[in-house]
């Protein structure tokens, strides 16, 4: 029996090595920030498979614009976005293929869509980020940020550039309507730019409070000693799975599937947590930030949010000007 098991194990290992050995060439991946994570994932995948990774890194808006420009001549195999609703839009447009990735049974419930086309390998949440020199203490709920004491101190990322903020605005409007966001806009809320520019405005003290700031940026900056703090308001926030997807036009489909498998590996998920993102697997926890179960959430109707997300993002920018 022992000899049989040894032979069986050897066969399994050889099969896995053979499958890996069959991979060659390259895979092209479009990924949002953080850039350090993208580089580490690419290096890890190449080390594991021998497949070269060509990358394009940008905001969700920049990635979508590039995909549109390349529509007649597809380059990308795998696309990762910071917006689940934009991933749903790609599926709706018939641009994705279905696949069952390795470790699918360990993925957080709901972070793989019903058609197995969107794979939430990580996630971020948005919260209230504040400069502790300008505002020493803060715990206000979203609606309370419209109070006169915060006039001229509010900023929000551009939801037409930030996928995370776009989904927050859609989720908040779908759940609570426009009154709170309009009141914050009337209180002088400004839009400095995408996530990085918006956080910079708070870090430098140009404004004191960032509404709907993406959390991993805050945790990373705090670890570097910046005078920042973050909390998730009691009214709830949007936790945004970051969908990795295989394009139906992928020139390197087998390599694309292998890359998706790698994203859910122990190694890749550890890299995710080191980048201050929430891991896509429920069996892996963070030690450097709040875990999923610690974050109050808005009940998200993603289909309803998809229907209003683009219009809501444009409207938010309009009322903040």
Which role fits each region the language model picked out?
Residues 1-26, 321:
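Short, low-complexity disordered leader/linker segments with a strong preference
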Residues 20-28, 43-49, 147-149:
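Immediate post-signal peptide segment of exported/extracytoplasmic ligand-binding proteins
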Residues 28-39, 58-62, 74-207:
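Extracytoplasmic ligand-binding site segments that recognize negatively charged/polar headgroups
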Residues 85-89, 208-227, 276:
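A ligand-binding cleft/hinge motif common to bilobed small-molecule-binding domains
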Residues 124, 182-185, 191-192, 225-248:
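Periplasmic-binding protein-like
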Residues 127-134, 170, 240-252, 271-272:
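A bilobed periplasmic-binding-protein/Venus flytrap-type ligand-binding module shared by bacterial periplasmic
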Residues 176-179, 280-321:
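An extracytoplasmic/periplasmic, membrane-proximal ligand-sensing/linker region
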Residues 237, 247-300:
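Mature extracytoplasmic/periplasmic domains
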């Amino acid at each position: 029996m022992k000899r049989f098991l040894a032979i069986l194990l050897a066969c399994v290992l050889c099969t896995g090595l053979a499958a890996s050995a069959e991979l060659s060439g390259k895979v092209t991946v479009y990924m949002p920030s953080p850039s350090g994570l993208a580089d580490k994932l690419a290096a890890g995948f190449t080390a594991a498979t021998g497949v070269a990774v060509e990358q394009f890194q940008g905001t969700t808006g920049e990635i979508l614009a590039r995909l549109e420009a390349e529509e007649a001549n597809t380059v990308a195999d795998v696309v990762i976005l910071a917006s689940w609703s934009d991933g749903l839009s790609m599926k709706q447009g018939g641009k994705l293929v279905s696949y069952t990735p390795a470790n699918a049974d360990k993925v957080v419930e709901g972070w793989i869509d019903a058609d197995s086309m969107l794979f939430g390998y990580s996630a971020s949440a948005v919260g209230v980020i504040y400069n502790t020199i300008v505002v020493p203490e803060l715990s206000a709920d979203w609606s309370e940020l419209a109070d006169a004491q915060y006039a001229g101190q509010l900023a929000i990322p551009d939801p037409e550039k930030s996928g995370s903020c776009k989904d927050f605005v859609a989720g908040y409007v779908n759940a609570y309507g426009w009154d709170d966001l309009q009141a914050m806009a009337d209180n002088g809320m400004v839009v400095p730019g995408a996530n990085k520019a918006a956080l910079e405005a708070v870090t430098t003290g140009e404004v004191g409070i960032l509404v709907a700031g993406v959390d991993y940026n805050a945790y990373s900056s705090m670890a570097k000693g910046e005078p920042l703090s973050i909390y998730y308001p009691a009214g709830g926030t949007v936790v945004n799975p970051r969908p990795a997807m295989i394009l139906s036009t992928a020139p390197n489909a087998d390599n694309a599937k292998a890359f998706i498998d790698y994203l859910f590996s122990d190694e890749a998920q550890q890299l995710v947590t080191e980048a201050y993102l929430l891991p896509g697997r429920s069996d892996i926890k963070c030690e450097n930030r709040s875990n999923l179960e610690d974050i109050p959430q808005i009940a998200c109707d993603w289909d309803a949010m998809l229907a209003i997300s683009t219009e809501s993002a444009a409207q938010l920018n309009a009322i903040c000007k």
